Amino acid sequence: MISPKDYGTEYGPLKVGPQRIELPNGMSLSYPDLRYADGEFIYTTQKGIVRTYGPRLAENVIQALARIVITDQMLEVHALPEVDVVLQVHDEIIALGSKLDSDVTMEKILNIMKTPPSWCTDLPLDAEGGVSQVYDK
């Protein structure tokens, strides 16, 4: 259980705050009035009381970190002058570009997506991609 004595404690790229977990991009996962009772975590939202458990909170953190990684990658791909990012679905970035030098452009995109973020340089990332006239899986 995280208690007030843990506030300010850092766990890798995460920092524990009162009723929240601060993420490496400055955003936070908030759990208002978080408490532990009768073997479960409880917090309050505008909709009422939410009961949850430790693994679900861990899943929230993992999903938030993954979202930060893909968003940062998407912004880097968007900065490439030869492509326009048009869609992002889960762990995919879909971009439009010229057929001219498409292999070179794809290699640039893959290098971006394989580069771990500065806040977790040992994160193992891999990527694959393809060039197509139409969107396909």
Predicted regions and their residues:
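Conserved catalytic core of nucleotide polymerization and phosphodiester-bond processing enzymes
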Residues: M1-K137
